[in-house]
From Swiss-Prot:
The lineage of its organism: Eukaryota, Metazoa, Chordata, Craniata, Vertebrata. This is Zinc finger imprinted 2. It comes from the Eukaryota. Its main location: nucleus. It is found in: Nucleus. The keyword RNA-binding does not apply. Residues 1-104, 247-322 are annotated as: Disordered. It comes from Homo sapiens (Human). A zinc finger (C2H2-type) spans 328-350, 356-378, 412-434, 466-488, 494-516. May be involved in transcriptional regulation. Keywords: DNA-binding, Metal-binding, Nucleus, Repeat, Transcription, Transcription regulation, Zinc, Zinc-finger. Residues 17-26, 35-56, 80-99, 297-307 have a biased composition (Basic and acidic residues). Highest levels of expression in adult testis; modest levels in fetal kidney and brain. Residues 176-246 form the KRAB domain.
């Protein structure tokens, strides 16, 4: 408890004494400790708990009370305050100078801040400075920069175990080259690109190349840039020509879409060249040629009817399609062809000219495929034996050489009966019938056998009825007709090997064998 002081001391403590006592008081024990305040509070409570009659000191007026220290104790800075200080430092750094910064200054600043990932931040700063072209102005040698930078970095091996060998990738002695920004596609990838993607690729590549040239880069022009520039110039020329030609186009259909413009830029087509309009016809492709001629006569390349006339400004050839066909028209049959080569090949049929001659037998042909097929007969391949006399006979692929084949006139005629077919395969099947008809059954004439197997009751397509010559009965299949014919001839070609009985059908012979299998064998009692 407080003891009363002497009378010599004044009852009221002066302000100077209170200030001196506060200075001599010990500081707080810890930045987070509030023990000083707790002591003051405890002293105050103990003083209030004393009886007022035992308190001998006179209470000081409120105006003369010593001022208490109401300031908060010292507390460690939080992360939020540290971030605010970093922001102020960064703003001060940005406003400090507008000159170009070197890579070393950026690295030092990054090390002072101690970011979470030093390698990633340094690489990002290097890429930004490299894109602005500032590293070329740095006068410090590259080797010295690498050494200083690696020495200044933290040496904690556990945090950056593999950073030493990455130092050579942080600083380069030269600026960016064209190979760094080159987007290289293989021919297969270029062919798979669409027209819009190809145009975008050309624009990006040329823009990157021109940007590097504008920055003062000195290097030879790559081959891909030369090709892209030629393609760009051709595209611009084609667009300008198309604009000039289509200025006089009629405005009846102003919203008519022009499809395929991008494909035309990549694959130029000259409208005056007839070879580009019609594909080359191979040998024996008259049906394709006829269809292409009909399509050309019905519509021009832009889809308009040539009979309606040509509007001014439409990209057409100087001569119409009908006038062009007049030059390729046959004088004998008035048939038109797309090219002069097809016309000359067709005229050989009328003139009888056969320029392709066999060197072994001196037989001439007017088409090369016919000569090639004929030469296979001399090699001895594709032969088979005759059923009766075992004489070598030519296969069906070579039988057409003995027939007058008019491939250009779209029909194939049999030399034996004069029957014509639209396809060569049907003629070969017909010739097989003639070869099979030579094997005659006993007592049957050649003409009768042919009628039994191949005569049709009706001529129109879809009815395949076979009629018997003896009784007039009609069958839908040849096999039924042959079985019916055996009833007239009493032919029984199927003979049992056990008893020698003959049958006209294989099903009858099968049933007969079943009867033999059901017979029970009789055992001899003696043996």
């Amino acid at each position: 408890m407080y003891q009363p002081e002497d009378d010599n001391n004044s009852d009221v403590t002066s302000d100077d004494d209170m200030t001196r006592n506060r200075r001599e008081s010990s500081p707080p024990h810890s930045v987070h400790s509030f023990s000083g305040d707790r002591d003051w509070d405890r002293r105050g409570r103990s003083r209030d708990m004393e009886p007022r009659d035992r308190w001998s000191h006179t209470r000081n007026p409120r105006s003369r009370m010593p001022p208490r220290d109401l300031s908060l104790p010292v507390v460690a800075k939080t992360s939020f305050e540290m971030d605010r200080e970093d922001d102020r430092d960064s703003r001060a750094y940005e406003s400090r100078s507008q000159d170009a910064e070197s890579y070393q200054n950026v690295v030092d600043l990054a090390e002072d801040r101690k970011p979470h990932n030093t390698i990633q931040d340094n690489m990002e700063n290097y890429r930004k400075l490299l894109s602005l072209g500032f590293l070329a102005q740095d006068s410090v040698p590259a080797e010295k920069r690498n050494t200083e930078m690696l020495d200044n970095l933290p040496s904690a091996g556990s945090q950056f175990p593999d950073f030493k060998h990455l130092g050579t990738f942080l600083v380069f002695e030269e600026l960016v080259t064209f190979e760094d920004v080159l987007v290289d596609f293989s021919p297969e990838e270029l062919s798979s690109l669409s027209a819009a993607q190809r145009n975008l690729y050309r624009e990006v590549m040329l823009e990157n190349y021109r940007n590097l040239v504008s920055l003062g880069h000195q290097f030879s022009k790559p081959d891909i840039i030369s090709r892209l520039e030629e393609e760009e110039s051709y595209a611009m020329e084609t667009d300008s020509r198309h604009t000039v030609i289509c200025q006089g186009e009629s405005h009846d259909d102003p919203l008519e879409p022009h499809q395929g413009n991008q494909e035309k830029l990549l694959t130029p087509i000259t409208m005056n060249d007839p070879k580009t309009l019609t594909p080359e016809r191979s040998y024996g492709s008259d049906e394709f040629e006829r269809s292409s001629n009909l399509s050309k006569q019905s519509k021009d390349p832009l889809g308009k009817d040539p009979q309606e006339g040509t509007a001014p400004g439409i990209c057409t050839s100087p001569q119409s399609a009908s006038q062009e066909n007049k030059h390729n028209r046959c004088e004998f049959c008035k048939r038109t062809f797309s090219t002069q080569v097809a016309l000359r090949r067709h005229e050989r049929i009328h003139t009888g000219k056969k320029p392709y001659e066999c060197k072994q037998c001196a037989e001439a042909f007017y088409l090369m495929p016919h000569l090639n097929r004929h030469q296979k007969t001399h090699s001895g391949r594709k032969t088979s034996g005759c059923n009766e006399g075992r004489k070598p006979s030519v296969q069906c692929a070579n039988l057409c050489e003995r027939v007058r084949i008019h491939s250009q006139e779209d029909y194939f005629e049999c030399f034996q009966c004069g029957k014509a077919f639209l396809q060569n395969v049907h003629l070969l099947q017909h010739l097989k019938a003639h070869e099979a008809a030579r094997v005659l059954p006993p007592g049957l004439s050649h003409s009768k056998t042919y009628l039994i197997r191949y005569q049709r009751k009706h001529d129109y397509v879809g009815e395949r009825a076979c009629q018997c010559c003896d009784c007039g009965r009609v069958f839908s299949r040849n096999s039924y007709l042959i079985q019916h014919y055996r009833t007239h001839t009493q032919e029984r070609p199927y003979q049992c090997q056990l008893c020698g009985k003959c049958f006209g059908r294989p099903s009858y012979l099968t049933q007969h064998y079943q009867l033999h299998s059901q017979e029970k064998t009789v055992e001899c009692d003696h043996c």
